[in-house]
A protein has these predicted regions:
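A short, Lys/Arg-rich alpha-helix, primarily the initiator
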Residues: 2-27
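Residues that mark the N-terminal boundary/hinge immediately upstream of a DNA-recognition element
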Residues: 20, 31, 57-60
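Short alpha-helical DNA-recognition segment
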Residues: 29-47
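Short, basic-rich loop-to-helix N-cap that marks the start of a DNA-contacting helix
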Residues: 53-66
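Short, charged recognition helix plus adjacent turn
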Residues: 75-110
Length: 110
């Protein structure tokens, strides 16, 4: 069984997110215990999130952002309207011209 390896770019983003969460907590004057209690998680889990540990569940991350009042910023994450590459791929698979209108068969005309 192979071990999951995150790409370096993803690892960096997880670490930056953890740092941002830590800054937001400190700006509010909250301890790790304060934010962990507000989010309903263990202090060690919050510390792992702030340290950018990739094994921290995405649900925990969303809950912590909610507890900080930063969850509205998640609306832009993977927004289909902002996915220009996906839109281009979808458009390339559409038929380029309309299909011919087929005459109805009179075989079943009573």
């Amino acid at each position: 069984m192979s071990k999951f390896m995150m790409p370096p770019q993803a690892t960096e983003r997880v670490a930056r997110l953890g740092q941002r969460i830590r800054v937001a907590r400190i700006r509010r004057g909250w301890s790790v215990a304060d934010l962990a209690n507000k989010a309903g998680i263990n202090r060690n889990t919050l510390t792992a999130l702030e340290l950018g540990k990739p094994g921290t569940a995405v649900g925990v991350c969303f809950t912590v952002l909610w507890a900080l009042g930063l969850d509205k910023s998640l609306d832009a994450v993977a927004d289909p309207d902002s996915d220009l590459h996906g839109k281009a791929l979808e458009a390339s698979r559409r038929p380029t011209r309309a299909s011919k209108i087929r005459k109805a068969s009179d075989d079943y005309d009573f």
